[in-house]
């Protein structure tokens, strides 16, 4: 316990508070003007509030740790004596369902109550038109367990909505039901009205029935780790909590990452991209805003703000449903009144600024902010009624008076007006400080809209971030020059350091523990370090659309590759990259050789590379066609490599020297559309392929010949099952699917589980085989874009999923 409190004392040094309180000169009228005395009192109150919040945060962390210990003890008591396990495997057993609430651990196979854990959800709706949301994992009408927020409310302002996730509305016409032919031994399903015929093994023909029921898998998934950070297009989204956790977001998940303990917790109450984040003055309550989305049935998912507890991960309030348009891009809590109010800016054409009493879920005022983009909005630290917004071609000082917001424009006067005011913060005496696209730091006197001081050319290029440290030091972060500079109270330069080019421009800066600075970059790195030392990454991820995923055959490692031209080998135990390789073309697919010694990466241009997995050195490079290579799949014996291309062909290579020599055998031609998926037979003699027009074809790859005999192909045992079309997996397709809803399928090595990734940001877990129409599944959210790939680690202990445009990688523990 003492260690826990000592960590907080390093965050907030209270000795200065005691010294200040004992200084009688602070109240001597003869030595101070009235305004100075008021400022001093404001500082004193703020310091006392900080100290109180320190104690609150410490107590909250104690409660959190006790909850973890109790849950672990309960699990151990149920399971009885077990072998000792490493701390990394035992601590993540905290049960957090996808609505961001903590539920008691239940025996495997039991379902959480749909009513959730929040008592207030059982109370009839009050006069507020904004419903408090408590979603929990549930079984959908089709038997599928879902984790979705209940979003209700009428829009007060209309406008277009958009989403990064691929919402698709199913056809209104009733889809055709599957047909079973006992004579021929096949099931025929229909996608977009087109028949897809799938032959079953002979020994299943007599016993098969379309009406048979499939049970939900007894296993479940729990989100253990999220790789990545959204810095490329979001700001002010990185904070250190007093508990020692760094909080940030990617996709629809807010990550709370304890770097020292190497543990992550996740708030997953959102149903689409999170775009903004704010921490309450109590340092425990957090607000996050999201974009509008569309569900798989075409239902609109409105943008909103969720306020939640960072200790319990319980959702406290949901505001703005039916009011915000497109997305919520900026949010901030008030400071001087204990954080009672919250301001938000949406992404409508008018970029409406609104102020809320978030505890009552009531809107106090709203106003059109600007026709141009708004980058930041924040309350003045000592005046609750003052809000500052900045963005393209503007800096506005807003005064809240009753239910109206009155605007004063920042006057640049002799100072050349910048194209963009990029960031804003406040000094100890209440001055407003801005950083702009011209590289200038401008100081605006407290209570005025005029410049009182200017630091010309503070950076070469735009200043993307400003952070006022607890000791009154100002830190600025440059975009173009990637420099981090500290400034004294009178704006004299103290220190500067340059962030290495590989990490990209600085997007946001936050104060860490002690003299540590946290940096988020536009290349989606989170760095930590000091102004006098080096900065090292604590989180990193891809920066462009992500499709390629390959699992090592014998190690807890996996490789991802994307359109950002990066191929990264990850350690799933240490949750960090083993190496990262920049390639010449955008990458689309990858596959490990069975020996694990090499990995192949396919690109959008028809080129493919083979890398040594130990050294990341290039082994060989080849080109087949000039179109996207969607699949790279080695045969189980390691003697062949099959490459599925968007030119409708499958290229076959003979492989020798443990994956280091390649000889082209030929190409399999016969598909009338692009290749989507490939699987090898256990004996490496046959290949099955799917295409974009729902064809299922079989091949003898050594001769590049198609196999048309049903009697030959129906009983083949497949080493993997990644094809989305086939008798053993057709139950994964939802009713009315258009044939593109499911991007990836993967069978576990033990052949009892099947996972899929769909176009609606969901990861599904089915029982295998999945050969009954509309089979039930457990459904998990987290991704905000289409889930492009899923695969089980070599021992089936974890599942890895990749998001497309959300660029995230999620590691799920199989429990």
UniProtKB/Swiss-Prot annotation:
Keywords: Coiled coil, Cytoplasm, Cytoskeleton, Disease variant, Epilepsy, Intellectual disability, Lissencephaly, Microtubule, Phosphoprotein, Repeat, WD repeat. Residues 156-168 have a biased composition (Low complexity). The keyword ATP-binding does not apply. Residues 176-815 are annotated as: Tandem atypical propeller in EMLs. Changing residue 547 to A: Abolishes tubulin binding. Residues 77-179 are annotated as: Disordered. The modification Phosphoserine is found at residue 113. Ubiquitous; expressed in most tissues with the exception of thymus and peripheral blood lymphocytes. One of its GO terms (cellular component) is mitotic spindle pole. GO terms for biological process: brain development; hematopoietic progenitor cell differentiation; microtubule cytoskeleton organization; mitotic spindle organization; neuroblast proliferation. It is found in: Cytoplasm; Cytoplasm, Perinuclear region; Cytoplasm, Cytoskeleton. Residues 143-153 have a biased composition (Basic and acidic residues). Its main location: cytoplasm. Residues 92-101, 126-138 have a biased composition (Polar residues). It comes from the Eukaryota. One of its GO terms (molecular function) is tubulin binding. It is linked to Band heterotopia: A brain malformation of the lissencephaly spectrum, resulting from disordered neuronal migration and characterized by bands of gray matter interposed in the central white matter. Disease features include severe developmental delay with intellectual disability, enlarged head circumference, periventricular and ribbon-like subcortical heterotopia, polymicrogyria and agenesis of the corpus callosum. Belongs to the WD repeat EMAP family. Contains a tandem atypical propeller in EMLs (TAPE) domain. The N-terminal beta-propeller is formed by canonical WD repeats; in contrast, the second beta-propeller contains one blade that is formed by discontinuous parts of the polypeptide chain. Homotrimer; self-association is mediated by the N-terminal coiled coil. Does not interact with EML3. Binds repolymerizing microtubules. Binds unpolymerized tubulins via its WD repeat region. Interacts with TASOR. Modulates the assembly and organization of the microtubule cytoskeleton, and probably plays a role in regulating the orientation of the mitotic spindle and the orientation of the plane of cell division. Required for normal proliferation of neuronal progenitor cells in the developing brain and for normal brain development. Does not affect neuron migration per se. This is Echinoderm microtubule-associated protein-like 1. It comes from Homo sapiens (Human).
